[in-house]
Amino acid sequence: MNLSEELDSIYKEAIQKIGSSISEEDLDKNKNDFIGKKGKLTAVLKNVASLSIEEKKTVGQKANELSKKLETFISETKTSLKKKLFEKQAASEFFDVLRPLSKPSNGSLHPITQIQYEIEDIFASMGFSVMDGPEIETDTNNFGALNFTEDHPAREMQDTFYLENGNLLRTHTSAIQVRTLRKLKPPFRIIAPGRVFRYEEVDASHEHTFYQIEGMVVGKDISAANLIDTMQVLLSRIFEKEIKTRLRPGYFPFVEPGFELDISCLVCDGKGCPVCKQSGWLELLPCGLIHPNVLSHAGLDPKEWTGFAFGLGLDRLVMMRYGIHDIRYFQSGNLRFLKQF
């Protein structure tokens, strides 16, 4: 039997074997047996080297034709097997179109949204209005009008997400403070909840995207005593118990004097943990009396008007309330975590 006859014999055998395949796995095995690297057709072609030039041309051309025919037949057989499998499944399966649908599970508000609404209600009871502002801000509203100097570290690329047009993702809800000072005439009391962004290394207590509530009161004869009293009312109503706090000096360009309001870590009861960085205290609320330059920039006379401002971190507040040890859970989208609230 010469090579041409051997090719015909292999082709007939391949058609018979491939055509009798009962599954895609069986088809793949038969395919490899004939046109795989170690297949029968491949083995025959290795003997072509011993033929004359004319015979090489004839046998090579025939081998290519048979190989293409087999590829086409394999493809058709695969389609046929898939169709038979689908028909078998369709015949064996039954779907009752009259069966009542399963009741969809109820959704719920994100824990941060829940506490935001609760805080809004608390401040509404104290005469505060709720304001809003864009997440994409100008450099002026986010920094300049808040008394940040041109060389302030917060303006640098490693701390702030800048856009190509020079705008930025707001780094604090204090930017809404600027818009409010231009929009409203004092006296007024406002809070401004929203999402903020900072280019930070993410860990158990830091996220690049988080939530704040900015608060601001502008009027006459506003003092630090008014600020402290407001914060005490807020914390006692949020946690429904006395919370150990401490007020320490802090520097923020838009307030003078500035304070840091810390609360005893409720995750570890002040003993030290990754959330409070083993200190037992958690920075919750930077605050202070509004800087005269901020009032002047808004067209208000700081000799006539005074006020206080604060920025409350909602993520950390929720962590303290529920004893959550990692801020990253809030942005994870993990339903097992979120369904607990």
From Swiss-Prot:
It is found in: Cytoplasm. Its main location: cytoplasm. One of its GO terms (biological process) is phenylalanyl-tRNA aminoacylation. It comes from the Bacteria. It is an enzyme of class 6 (ligase). GO terms for cellular component: cytoplasm. Mg(2+) binds at E256. SUPFAM superfamilies: Class II aaRS and biotin synthetases (SSF55681), tRNA-binding arm (SSF46589). Keywords: Aminoacyl-tRNA synthetase, ATP-binding, Cytoplasm, Ligase, Magnesium, Metal-binding, Nucleotide-binding, Protein biosynthesis. InterPro entries: aa-tRNA-synth_II (IPR006195), aa-tRNA-synth_II/BPL/LPL (IPR045864), Phe-tRNA-synth_IIc_asu (IPR004529), Phe-tRNA_ligase_II_N (IPR004188), Phe_tRNA_ligase_alpha1_bac (IPR022911), Phenylalanyl-tRNA_Synthase (IPR002319), tRNA-bd_arm (IPR010978). Binds 2 magnesium ions per tetramer. Tetramer of two alpha and two beta subunits. NCBIfam families: pheS (TIGR00468). Belongs to the class-II aminoacyl-tRNA synthetase family. Phe-tRNA synthetase alpha subunit type 1 subfamily. This is Phenylalanine--tRNA ligase alpha subunit. It comes from Leptospira interrogans serogroup Icterohaemorrhagiae serovar Lai (strain 56601).
